[in-house]
Swiss-Prot record:
Quaternary context: Monomer.
Record-level GO BP terms: protoporphyrinogen IX biosynthetic process
Catalytic activity: 4 porphobilinogen + H2O = hydroxymethylbilane + 4 NH4(+)
S-(dipyrrolylmethanemethyl)cysteine modifications at: 251
Extra information: The porphobilinogen subunits are added to the dipyrromethane group.
GO cellular component, one term: cytoplasm
Superkingdom field: Bacteria
PROSITE patterns: PORPHOBILINOGEN_DEAM
Protein name in the entry: Porphobilinogen deaminase
Cofactor annotation comment: Binds 1 dipyrromethane group covalently.
Keyword line: Porphyrin biosynthesis, Transferase
Entry EC number(s): 2.5.1.61
Amino acid sequence: MPTQPVVRIGARGSKLSLTQSGIVQRRIAAALGVDPDNAAEVERVAPLIPITTTGDRVQDRRLLEIGGKGLFTKEIEEALMDGRIDCAVHSMKDMPAELPEGLCIAAIPEREDPRDAFISRGPERLEDLTEGAILGTASLRRQAQCLHRRPDLEAKLLRGNVETRLGKLEAGEYDAILLAYSGLRRLGLGHLPKSLIDPKEAPPAPGQGALAVETRAADRDLPWAQALRCRPTTLAVAAERGALIALEGSCRTPIGAHAWLEGGTCKLIVEALSPDGKLRFRHSGEAELSQMADPEASARDLGLSLGLAVKEEAGDAIVL
């Protein structure tokens, strides 16, 4: 009998990352012909390899102060390039606009709800917070979007895993916090938010709610990778990341992008703000993809076009 392939999966060591990686792990095992409910067999053919990243170790500063989004992926990508793992599972919103040479995003599974979640010790909505209330977030985008709507609020740094952030809210260090709803749902905490932020009013981070399965470029089209792909999610994320690339997005730039499909049409909203929320630059548009030879490239082109329009209008106003 031929030897069954083994796919080693690299992931950050946090509870959320391991939960998200576990979702992909079971999908890979199924693609390899293993019962996804047989935990021992799943671990045998698709073992999880936890890797601690610099972004996990440094918790007292914003990402932009210590190197940006790549700090959540660098060590994992090194393991991928060295051959210690065969794929890596990331939150798509943590992926930099440009990937290291020789690596690629081989699959994007079905997306979770991309909205931001508002969690507080009382008020139901951002608008209901008292004047001067303390809002916790480590995201420059969330900070800018909230200050645009509520300039009287005090935005305060909030780093750490989901459990740590919720604990700080409960301890009274913050009046409210904002988290990605997708992560809460995957952790079984989807009941905690008081409300959800309308993504057309305040677009989330490009790719929020989606997972990226990264491989070596030579492994892009292996059968197990193809089995993970979700076409609607791939097209929407292509549009959002097109905007990210056009805006040269990083943790120093408050950028939101929200794409969705209506039939064969991809619709996209892109916005960028000044870090203090006083200035907001927004463009929206759509592209018909159903007749295109390469729908993913066409979706990306839509994002590039709208992102460039925002960039030309905003200039240096959106960079911290």
